Every structure is written in C-alpha cells, then in structure tokens.
Amino acid sequence: TSISAGVENRTNYTYLTNIGQSYTVDNSTLPTYNVKARQFDGSIQVLSANLQQNFKLGPLHWDNDITWQVSSNKEILPLPQLNIFTDLYFKFLYAKRLEIEAGANMTCFTKYSAPTYSPATGMFHLQNNSKIQEVGGYPLINAYANFRIQGVRFYVMYYHANNNLLKNTDSFFVPGYPLNPSMVKFGLSWTFFD
C-alpha cells in the first residue's frame, strides 16, 4: 500500500489557448483556429492524493492506482477530479520456464473539459469557450496476455474490449478524437546476448 498527497503551486503558468471564432458557410458552422500562447499572471494550486493498493492471492493479482486531484483554476488548468487504473490478472510459471501473465485492465477518469489537440502545431491547447466538449466518464478496458521465456517476450492484447458492449458515444480521451475501435495488437521483444 502506498499513499501520497501533495500541493503544487504553479506561478506564471504558460499555456496555449484557441481564440478563434466560428463562421458559417453554406449553413455549416466551421471553427477557425488561432492558437496563442498565454501566461497566467497569478498562481494556480493543484491539490492531489494518490492511493496504490496491490492484492495477491496465489497466482491472482489485483493492482489498483487511484488519484484524486483538484485545480484552483479549472479554466486555465483543467484536470479530471478522479483517475482510476485497475489491473486484474493471473501470473504464473508454466513448465518451469514460461512466465505467463493474463488478465484485463481498466482506465477511467471523471468528466472534464480537457485540452484539445491541434494537428497544425502538434500540441494541446485549451478549448474555445464557445463550444466546450467534456471527455471522460468512460472506461477503457483491455484484455491481454504476456509471455516471457529467457530473453524473448511476446504479448497479445485485445484493445478497447468494451467498445461493442457499451452503447456510448462518449468514448473520447481528447476532444474531437474518438478512441480507436476494438483491435487485436501483437508485440515481440527479443534480447540477443553477446
């Protein structure tokens, strides 16, 4: 078990914001992007607390990480109030050589008006106040299996396993960019020894 808490004081906080306005063409409202750097003259305090608790019962593991945080100025430094990561898996040795870890993990955070991504700059900026899109409140669940034998590691993951289970259109972690649909991912890492 690990518990931590803290207060961070940020002075002269620099951020990007979109000061562009929307315009109408052929009955369609289109946004303009005018991203500018700004500096907040005052100070912003961030209060946070974190709890990490891991359970183990034989080969069954359950790892949890919960973070609570609040910003004194949510318009300039928006943060989700609660972040949750949980990982439930079996970890065991097969035939005294092959390490196997199989389970599922979930990431979820409370809704908030997250910074949006600007492809032109490759950076995140605050959303335009004329149209705020909140993200969060949606669990992202992945099922996976990891295998390791000596210097070889292999994994297979079913990413966004709950995509077809929940009829929810709020599957965004970044405004305007939906999460990828369910997919299977593979990976291989092979360490060669000299």
Each language-model region and where it sits:
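Exposed, low-structure sequence patches enriched in small/polar residues
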Residues: 1-194
